[in-house]
Amino acid sequence: AVMASNIDAFRTLRNRPHVVILGAGASVAAIPCGDKYGRKISVMDGFIDNLGMRDILAGSNFKSENLEDIYSELSKHQEYDEIREKLENSIRDYFSQYYLPEEPTIYDLLLLSLKEKDIVATFNWDPLLVLAYLRCREITLKLPQLLFLHGNVAVQLCLEEKRIFFQLYQGYCRQCQNQLSPCRLLYPVQQKNYNADPYIKNQWDRLKYYLSYAYIVTIFGYSAPATDIEAVNL
């Protein structure tokens, strides 16, 4: 009876999801030698120079090198709206240029090692996880679900059908033929409002649900900033 009880408990646990949470360090580890064209991906340290945004920010008087500090200040002052918009466009353009190398990456191996009940939630804007997912779909459809907690450059939305598409560039919905909208990127203000965007809110609500009964939680390459209260409270 005890053994049967243990087996039942094991089966119950086995059916619970493995939740994997990814940060910038995971994408760095995925392409340690650079992407398909040898481009290294940047973490937040040195981000301003790596994005070539030094000239864009020359019109402001910020001394901080921290992107979150800079973006938070830009968001507070209407006179910096043009600079902020250029910064946002630079971020989206920068991450949209990355392509996976031909050989399998950590992301490919991660996705293939998980099951359909499992979850991979990422804070990253870059398309590497999505590109790995699309590549793995050529092998199997039994892949984990993906959640994008800060949005992603490779996610397009059909607002009419409430469907998402994994692709880098805008196209048209296969159902209603309406033009797709780029997923909003949640930029690094000190007080993030995860409820302002319906898609982002949905991603966070789903993550909290899966975390509530997860069997295993793995955090890879992520260290929650003290200012990101929502992430810290997870």
Question: Language-model segments: which ranges?
Answer:
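Glycine-rich anion-binding loop/nest that anchors nucleotide
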Residues: V19-G25, A121-N124, Q179-L234
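Cys/His-rich short segments
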Residues: F148-Y199
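Metal-dependent nucleotidyl/phosphoryl-transfer cores and adjacent nucleic-acid-binding surfaces
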Residues: R14-R16, I41, M53, C158-K162, ...
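Short glycine-/polar-rich loops that comprise or flank the Walker A/P-loop
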Residues: E116-D118, L143-P144, Y215
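Short helix/loop capping segments that flank catalytic or ligand/cofactor-binding pockets
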Residues: A29-I31, L129-A132, Q156-L159, F166-L168, ...
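Gly/serine-rich nucleotide phosphate-binding loop at the start of the catalytic core
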Residues: A1-L129, E138, P225
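Short, aromatic/basic amphipathic alpha-helical patches
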Residues: A132-E138, N233-L234
